[in-house]
């Protein structure tokens, strides 16, 4: 059961609505049932560092219908957590939802209750974030705060206090480890993709620091009170492009200097339209105290971790997961070789590449 997340007064304000006509039409081709969107508002939200906000809004998408046992507990909830600065809706694409959410597929939405939240602070989402108005006065949240916000949304908003499955990608993968350690009774199984169960350090942290400093050290940042996006955000997005790269694929798709240059220019131009500097900095800094290594033995969930050799963020050659995952009972680790189907860090969007391992995990649960 979900315990109360610290001592706070939370009031659920649910505003459920069907997705837009365009979204519903697109989702109809990808899922067994259409998605619905809603918002949950928690009052007097306290952050781990002592800061607080009078209220936070958590936006979410749900697909399917909750099923309850005789005690009223939801038995078919699947929570899917997105990566840094994304939103829950990023999974509603053919390569993910089209492979998993349809009739007869592994996460058939007519069987499971799928929950896709926009995480606290995430720039592309509709949940509360710095760019809503507080800018650099926004509380300096971390992953524990983000998990707390989602747990409140689940328990007090959607009346879900138990997860059949947590699917976590990138940041969501890291949060999965933290969640299963701090609240081991919450989650039956976790399908985790593109992360490592150890402190963000080495090259991973160095790149995060470079991106954060690209923005914060730009005079145009003005301590977060800029009137236009600081130029340093462009450099930060450039760093992000490199670490998110899929070298084998990109060599094939952009085989000339002109093609590569055009891709970079298009990528920067498009991402500058949707990225806010404060949102960006806050999200990447939220990993600053992530370190699940010491408590892996507390995890009770069945765990499947899948990484790829072409993931710049989480290099497979370091052997971290092979050494650490055995500490978590009922855990498995798979390191995928580089193929024409892998996409570097973002291989998690290509469900066809790893869905057989999800199937194995569900088999352990008896489906």
Predicted regions and their residues:
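Alpha/beta-hydrolase-fold enzymes
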Residues: 186-270
């Amino acid at each position: 059961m979900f315990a109360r997340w610290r001592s706070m007064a939370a009031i659920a304000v649910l505003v459920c609505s069907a997705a837009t006509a365009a979204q519903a039409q697109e989702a109809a081709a990808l899922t067994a049932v259409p998605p619905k969107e809603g918002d949950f508002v928690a009052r007097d939200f306290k952050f781990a560092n002592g800061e607080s906000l009078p209220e936070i809004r958590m936006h979410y998408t749900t697909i399917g219908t909750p099923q309850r046992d005789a005690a009223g507990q939801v038995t078919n909830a699947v929570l899917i957590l997105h990566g840094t600065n994304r939103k829950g809706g990023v999974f509603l694409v053919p390569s993910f939802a089209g492979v998993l959410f349809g009739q007869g597929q592994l996460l058939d939405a007519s069987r499971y209750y799928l929950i896709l939240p926009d995480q606290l602070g995430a720039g592309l989402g509709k949940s509360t974030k710095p760019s809503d108005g507080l800018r650099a006065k926004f509380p300096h949240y971390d992953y524990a705060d983000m998990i707390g916000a989602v747990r409140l949304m689940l328990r007090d908003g959607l009346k879900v206090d138990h997860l059949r499955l947590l699917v976590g990608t990138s940041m969501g993968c890291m949060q999965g480890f933290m969640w299963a350690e701090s609240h081991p009774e919450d989650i039956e199984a976790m399908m985790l993709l593109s992360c490592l169960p150890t402190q963000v350090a080495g090259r991973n942290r160095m790149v995060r620091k470079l991106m954060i400093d690209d923005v914060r050290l730009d005079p145009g940042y003005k301590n977060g009170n800029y009137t236009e996006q600081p130029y340093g955000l462009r450099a930060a997005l450039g760093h992000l492009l490199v670490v998110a790269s899929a070298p084998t694929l990109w060599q094939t798709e952009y085989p000339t200097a002109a093609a590569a240059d055009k891709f970079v220019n298009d990528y920067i131009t498009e991402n500058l339209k949707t990225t806010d500097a404060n949102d960006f900095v806050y999200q990447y800094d939220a990993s600053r105290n992530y370190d699940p290594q010491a408590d892996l033995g507390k995890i009770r969930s069945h765990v499947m971790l899948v990484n790829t050799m072409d993931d710049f963020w989480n290099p497979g050659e370091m052997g971290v997961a092979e050494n650490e995952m055995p500490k978590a009972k009922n855990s498995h680790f798979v390191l995928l070789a580089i193929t024409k189907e892998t996409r570097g860090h973002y291989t998690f969007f290509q469900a066809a590449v790893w869905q057989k391992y999800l199937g194995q995990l569900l088999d352990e649960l008896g489906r």
